[in-house]
């Protein structure tokens, strides 16, 4: 797996722990990867969980995958955790962990990003995921 194979927007279609209603509660659930300078970064949101990813490509027993740590919001509380994913027959499959909380397998499919999304990293400490989304929607395009 290369960085290029991951770059882009992936729509979360299924999670082991949460149903489609929760996944798409605030925005359509997604995970997105991009290069910042020479580093693979990303972001995700499902339900009221939103996070920014610091990613690394790894290889174990001949299988390539991406792993990450994340920080962000879990409902209106600070959140953090880790996760991993691999490509499987055109899908992104993996597992997301919330530190000292739930973890869930997920599946995602590549899609075009719906509408404009401000991809600049910003602190949202003390702001709920829905408030953060409204704030991003009001940000003028860069």
Regions found by a protein language model. Give the residues of each.
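Short, surface-exposed beta-strand/loop "edge" segments at domain boundaries and coil↔beta transitions
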Residues: 20, 48-54, 73-79, 100-106
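Eukaryotic intrinsically disordered, low-complexity regulatory regions
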Residues: 140-142
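Mid-chain, well-packed structural core segment of small domains
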Residues: 55-89
């Amino acid at each position: 797996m290369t960085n290029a194979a991951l770059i882009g927007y992936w729509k979360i279609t299924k999670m082991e722990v949460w149903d489609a209603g929760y996944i798409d509660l605030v925005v359509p659930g997604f995970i997105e990867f991009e290069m910042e300078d020479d580093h693979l970064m990303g972001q995700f949101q499902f339900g009221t969980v939103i996070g920014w990813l610091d990613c690394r490509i790894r290889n174990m027993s001949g299988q390539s995958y991406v792993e990450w740590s994340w920080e962000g919001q879990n409902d209106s509380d600070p959140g953090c955790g880790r996760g991993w994913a691999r490509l499987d027959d055109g899908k992104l499959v993996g597992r997301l962990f919330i530190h000292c909380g739930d973890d869930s397998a997920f599946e995602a499919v590549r899609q075009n990003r719906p509408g404009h999304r401000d991809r600049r990293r910003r602190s949202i400490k003390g702001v709920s995921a829905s408030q953060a989304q409204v704030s991003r929607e009001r940000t003028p395009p860069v």
